[in-house]
Each structure stands twice: as C-alpha cells, then as structure tokens.
Amino acid sequence: MARSGAKFINYMNKGAIVIDNGTGMIKAGFAGDDAPKACFPNVIGKPKYDAIQVGNNKEIYIGDDALDKKGILSLEYPLEHGIVNNWDHMQRVWKHTFDNELAVEPEDYPVLMTEAPMNPKENREKMVQFFFEDLQVPSFYVFTQAVLALYGSGKTTGLVVDSGDGVTHIVVVYEAYCINHAINRVDLAGRDLTSYLQKLLTECNVYLNTTSDFETVRKIKEKVCYLALDFDEESKNLKEKKIEYQLPDNSVIQIGDQAIRCPELLFNPSLEGKDIKGIHECIVDSIKKADIDLRKELYQNILLSGGTSMFEGIQERLNKEISGKAPPNTQIRIIAPVERKYSVWIGGSVMATLATFQTSWITAEEYQEEGENVVHRKCF
C-alpha cells in the first residue's frame, strides 16, 4: 500500500489535474484554478510524404503544432462524436498534455477526466488502464461532462445542452446524476457546421474546400455566424447588407445569409438532408422523458455548455422554439454563462477540490486489486 495514508494526503494537498477531453479541443489545468492552463486542438498530424522534411523532422505533430503545418500534414482526430476511435493517437495526446502543455509528471497528480454521456464501457476501461499502467497516476476519476457543466454553474439539477465540436448531448441531471433514459445524443455540432459553411461559401464564389482550409472556415464561422430570431426576415436583411471578412491572404470576401444559414442547421438539420431532430425538439423530448414532477424545474434550468453554444442569438432563439413546443404557460429559462465554452472544465476544477469528493477517487491500490472494472463501481 505504497501510496496510502500520509502520502496520499500529500497528493491531495498538491491538487489534481483536470482534463476535459473534447472532440475538438483538450482543456487541461489544475484543480482550483478559474480557467484551464492549456487549451489546444485534439488533433494529430503526420507528414503526407516520407521525403518531406518538416522542421526537426518529427514523425507526429500534436495540437496547434499540427494545425500550423496542416498544408503538409495529414490531420487525424482521435475522437469522433465524443468517443475515442483511435487509442494510439488519443494516448499520444494525453502524454503530450502532461509533457508539453502542463510540464508536470503524471505520477505526481491525481487526474480528473471527463467523458461523453453513455461512453462505451470498454472505452472507460481502456482509459483507466492507460492512466494507471502507462502514466502511473496515483488516483483517477472520470466524470460525465454534462454533470460537471451543471455543477460549474452552481446547480445539481437541470437540463444541459452540451454542444462542442463533435457531438451535441441533451442531458437531464437530477441531484448530480444523469438520467440515462432521457439523454438525447445529436451527431451534429461544431465540426458539422464548419463543413456546412464550406459548402455555403461556394455560393459566394469562395472555395475553401481543402483540409488545410478547414481551420480558416472555422474562424469565419466563429466570427461571422449568428442565429436569427426570425430566419426569413434576417435573410432578407443580409441579402441587402452583406458582411465583410478578411481572409489570411488579406483578400476580403462578402458573406450574405450564409451567416445565419450555417447555425440554422442546429434547428433544421434537414437543410443538409439530415433526418434528425433539431436541438429544440430534442430538449423538449428529453424533458418529456423525465419524471412529470421534475419537468417544470427542467424547463426553468436549461443550461448551455460548449463552444457551439456560443453563437450570438442562441438564447433567444431557443426560448422561442421551446415555447412553441412546451405545454401552455410554461416558464422557460435558458442559462448561458459567459464562460460556457469552459463550463465542463470549471465544474471539474471545483469538484476536484471539494473535501467531500476526496474519498471518491479511484486509487492505484484499488485499481491493482480490482482491475479496470473499478471504474464502473466508483464512477457512475
């Protein structure tokens, strides 16, 4: 029991590391801080051609380093729709987080990791195995992202709309527990909107269709796009008065109603031929699956989280659309914290410092005794 007793308390006093493992971005830092120390793209880049010498001729590039050289690299994302699909790449990103982004030894810190709702059991097991066996962390815990987002806003009951780069989850949380049968997963999020905007820009004779252009289009989306309260009326306005945007090569493009058609996909996925419900319909559907006595409280505590919830106008539009589908006279409140891009990480930062949480960690000893299955017993 080498890490028990006083030594384990020393780890707790030192603090924990919190990693929000997003499809698009990794947010990592130290528990108790107000914001993550490191935020970097969750992407791996490999040279397209063996003959190319890239800088110091590394075989693999991670995060911003990969995006900076995207023209001569093949980019691959370890997560798809919130779920790990390439474990070798994911593990490289985690090692990079400790070695380069945080510059700490993993064996010195407990680690609180986030996961998507209903993460496959085998994925949780592989994760806990890697952190204990490869990184040698003293203790570990994995939390559902939506629960931490809600916790970071000071609540333990509510409905979380967590929309990042790879997936949107609508999650009912009651007293800090996910109600699994009421979860709605929508495979439509930031990356899909960026891809859709690539297509829409061709209408303006703007062709940014290569992999290396994708990051440019993402920046256009974040700077220019917004949600219209009245789509038809706003579309007319944008046909008369276009929005100018300067590209990296200093050329200027003009964008019309593409600025509102791009995020409109969240409410009308059929615009791109997707046979799925809009997020407003999924929200109402999740609330209907919850206990009838809980529904009023859920309608009044709809929390937005994640980078794709940052569009200007999203609060007002959601309120309008949900009001049209909720029971008459239902009071609706959409909570959109300014820092919602980092809500999940902030919730983890708060959680990992609580005195009441310290007995919840999976310790290295527990892992040695029980193996990977310990994650299902202790993290639920």
For the regions a protein language model found, what residue spans apply to each?
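C-terminal region/appendage detector
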Residues: 1-380
